[in-house]
């Protein structure tokens, strides 16, 4: 079977940001959601956060040790269930579970199949959640996906996220992010209305026309990897990946 998904929030052009903006603040962020908030503020000129981050889990049958760059969770009584639990008050929010040990794929394997995820006491159905949540027994993580799991969108309710811990684990980031959907839709609407779709394609070349002054930086939504070369008005320009 084949599934085709449409991204209603795709911004198919470049965005202008101030030349004086320090993009290091994104790379030096302490968490995934902090990085997203810093990127959002740079692109939108909004001082408010796009995400609220929650990491104060209630522990049941668990002992946590704060290490230098990570946290170690140990099940106290191996014969009894162990849980991490928190409740988020939602009002038109999209929720994500952030579970990350490292950006190195080989290290993330160590936390695979550590949890079963429950939303309001209902086991998250792997076939109805997303394509990264693949194990038939409902455990997570199971496939490297930047450590994020889509928990769904909620209008006006309290949502309780409970993680059943299946074994001891070490982790760098464990949190739930709540995205303000209204704020995000407003951001996308503003950006898509401001910039015209002047992108053309020719084999392995992507062209975009835009007008800016010397005080702006062109931010492209095109995914970047090694091998890309950028020319502006025929002159080679360096690319900074953020």
Where are these regions (language model features)?
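General structural signal for secondary-structure boundaries
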Residues: 19-29, 34-35, 177-185, 201
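Active-site-proximal, structured, solvent-exposed surfaces of multi-pass membrane proteins
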Residues: 5, 11, 47-242
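Aromatic/acidic, Gly/Pro-rich catalytic loop(s) in extracytoplasmic/lumenal soluble domains
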Residues: 1-33, 122
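Catalytic-adjacent loop/helix segments of enzymes that bind and process anionic phosphate/sulfate esters
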Residues: 21-64
């Amino acid at each position: 079977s084949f599934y085709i998904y449409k991204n209603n929030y795709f911004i198919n052009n470049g965005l202008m940001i101030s030349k004086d903006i320090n993009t290091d603040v994104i790379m030096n962020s302490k968490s995934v959601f902090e990085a997203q908030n810093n990127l959002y503020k740079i692109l939108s000129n909004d001082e408010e956060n796009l995400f609220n981050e929650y990491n104060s889990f209630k522990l049941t049958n668990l002992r946590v040790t704060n290490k230098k760059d990570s946290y170690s969770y140990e099940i106290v009584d191996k014969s009894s269930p162990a849980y991490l639990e928190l409740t988020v008050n939602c009002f038109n929010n999209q929720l994500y579970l952030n579970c990350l040990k490292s950006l190195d794929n080989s290290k993330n394997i160590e936390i695979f199949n550590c949890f079963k995820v429950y939303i309001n006491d209902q086991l998250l159905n792997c076939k109805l959640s997303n394509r990264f949540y693949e194990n038939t027994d409902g455990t997570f993580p199971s496939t490297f996906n930047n450590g994020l799991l889509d928990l769904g969108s909620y209008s006006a309710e309290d949502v309780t996220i409970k993680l059943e811990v299946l074994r001891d684990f070490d982790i760098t980031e464990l949190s739930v992010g709540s995205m303000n959907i209204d704020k995000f839709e407003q951001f996308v609407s503003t950006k898509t209305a401001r910039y015209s779709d002047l992108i053309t394609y020719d084999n392995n070349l992507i062209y975009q026309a835009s007008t800016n002054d010397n005080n702006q930086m062109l931010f492209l939504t095109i995914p970047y990897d090694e091998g890309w070369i950028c020319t502006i008005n025929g002159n080679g320009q360096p690319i900074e990946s953020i």
